[in-house]
Structures are given as structure tokens and as C-alpha cells.
Amino acid sequence: ADFALVDEALNKLGISHFADRIYMLMSGGEKQLINLARILVQQPQLILFDEPTSALDYGNVFKTLSLIKELSLQGFTIIMTTHNPDHPMLLHSALPHSRVTILNEHGKLQTGTAPEIITEANLKALYQTDLRLVDVPALQRQICAITHL
């Protein structure tokens, strides 16, 4: 691979200090970030992120979602799977053109914008629990919340 592309990808993710580390000795979150850098080096037009924030702490979740937003703004087509309904809602606030698709409880696909698809009815049906969408004025968006244990 072109070393300049590798350096650019590591710098974009803020992980240039990982360049001399051994992959097998890294944490799960660090490996996830290295895997993202490996994708960027390939310069694809379409990027599939399969649960890109699993095993990440909140700081790295922020970096990963910010990167996904930036890649989308740069013209990459992004497909992301997630079990966290807050992520597409958060991305929608930055990328209102983005589309969300869910596999509903009947095995059918539903596609639309995050507010159209991520509804309390869909959340309750998908997760079989009492999830609520709560308006958070300070964030100027809704968040998904578990109402009780």
C-alpha cells in the first residue's frame, strides 16, 4: 500500500500513534479504528460499516460517527448496520438526506428518513420492549430511551 495513504488514513482517525503497534496486542476498540483506516486506504466508493461502534467507548463512538458523516459529505456511499437507534437519528441531524432501512417484525424492509422510520411503534416491535423517543431540547433532537427495567 502507498505509505502516504496509510499516513493520511491514520491521521484522519487521529491514530497515527498506532502505526508502530502490533495489531494483535491492541484492544477491541483500537482494532476497530485500525480496520477503519484499512478501509480508507483502499479508497472505495461504497463503504459497508457492520456495527462500527461495537466495542468502542463514547469518545471513539463520536470519532467513528463523525468519520462516517465526513465520508458521506465527501461523496462516499455509506451503508451501516447498527442495533443502536440513536446513531441513525444523530447522523440524520447532520445528514438530513440520509436514508434508514429497517427489517420490521414481519420480515419486510421499511425505508425512509430516520424520523420516518425510527418511531416508537417500530422500536417497540423490533426490540420487544417499551422504548420511547424523548425530545431533548438542548440537543435539538430525540433520543431513544429505555423507560424502565
Residue ranges with predicted function:
Residues 1-18, 43:
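Conserved ABC ATPase "signature" region
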Residues 22-26, 30:
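Conserved ABC ATPase signature
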Residues 36-37:
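Hydrophobic anchor residue at the start of the ABC signature
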Residues 47-51:
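Catalytic Walker B motif of ABC-type/P-loop ATPase nucleotide-binding domains
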Residues 82-83:
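H-loop/switch region of ABC-family ATPase nucleotide-binding domains
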Residues 91-114:
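H-loop (His-switch) and adjacent beta-strand-loop-beta switch element
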Residues 114-149:
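ABC ATPase nucleotide-binding domains
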